[in-house]
């Protein structure tokens, strides 16, 4: 599938046609969720954040809004929506959730569930300075181009795992964020 002319309707029909298979087994017990905010435009965008530099984990990294599930969250989707509101001021009622991707294991011991949602283009999103240093929009068509991601095999604690790397403008997109974007591309039928 060629992503260069990806419209929102095409993305939605492909995502809903090819439902994710939730067969992923994990040993992780801690749950987290991220929102993949797709901006409703004829040529859709993807809202991403850059984490604040003072954070203990993943400082300065490009990420989706999200975080750990807490005891007040009714579901993984509720956790993703709460975190998106806290981090970038996206009201939960403004998000049209269209589905979830299979969970991904993080190197920090979380099982992370990506929640795909459509958001209006005119939301006055803003970064929570405690958690986020920047909020930016990337064209969805570019984010889903598999050729933009480059593999790097990393050895950590005696184990090898593959990390994906990419750039968008001056932002370095890698790790879990790049992996989730690749999984989303594969989910809608983009061929490697």
From Swiss-Prot:
- Source domain of life: Bacteria
Q: Where is the Nudix hydrolase domain?
A: 29-160
Q: What class of enzyme is it?
A: hydrolase
**Positions of disulphide bridges:** none
Return the EC number: 3.6.1.-
For the biological process aspect of GO, one term held by this record is: nucleoside diphosphate metabolic process
- Name the PROSITE patterns for this protein: NUDIX, NUDIX_COA
Q: Where does Mg(2+) bind?
A: 83, 87
Give UniProt keywords alphabetically.
Hydrolase, Magnesium, Manganese, Metal-binding
Swiss-Prot/TrEMBL cofactor(s): Mn(2+); Mg(2+)
Q: Name one GO molecular function term.
A: magnesium ion binding
Which Gene3D superfamilies does the annotation name?
Nucleoside Triphosphate Pyrophosphohydrolase
Where is the short sequence motif Nudix box located? 67-89
Per the record, the similarity remark reads: Belongs to the Nudix hydrolase family. PCD1 subfamily.
Question: Which purpose does this protein serve, as stated in its record?
Answer: Probably mediates the hydrolysis of some nucleoside diphosphate derivatives.
What is the name attached to this protein's record?
A: Uncharacterized Nudix hydrolase NudL
**Organism for this UniProt entry:** Salmonella newport (strain SL254)
């Amino acid at each position: 599938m060629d992503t260069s002319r990806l419209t929102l309707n095409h993305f939605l029909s492909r995502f809903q046609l090819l439902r994710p298979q939730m067969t992923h087994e994990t040993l992780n017990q801690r749950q987290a969720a991220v929102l993949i905010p797709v901006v409703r435009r004829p040529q859709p965008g993807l809202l991403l954040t850059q984490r604040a530099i003072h954070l203990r984990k993943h400082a300065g990294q490009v990420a989706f809004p999200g975080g750990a599930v807490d005891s007040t969250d009714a579901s993984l989707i509720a956790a993703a929506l709460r975190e998106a509101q806290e981090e970038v001021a996206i009201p939960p009622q403004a998000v049209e959730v269209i589905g979830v991707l299979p969970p991904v294991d993080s190197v920090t011991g979380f099982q992370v569930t990506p929640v795909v949602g459509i958001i209006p283009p005119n939301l006055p999103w803003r970064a929570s300075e405690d958690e986020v240093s920047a909020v930016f929009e990337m064209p969805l068509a570019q984010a889903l181009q598999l050729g933009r991601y480059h593999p790097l095999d990393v050895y950590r604690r005696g184990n090898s795992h593959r990390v994906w790397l990419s750039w968008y403008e001056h932002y370095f997109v890698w790790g879990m964020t790049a992996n989730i974007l690749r999984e989303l591309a594969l989910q809608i039928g983009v061929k490697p």
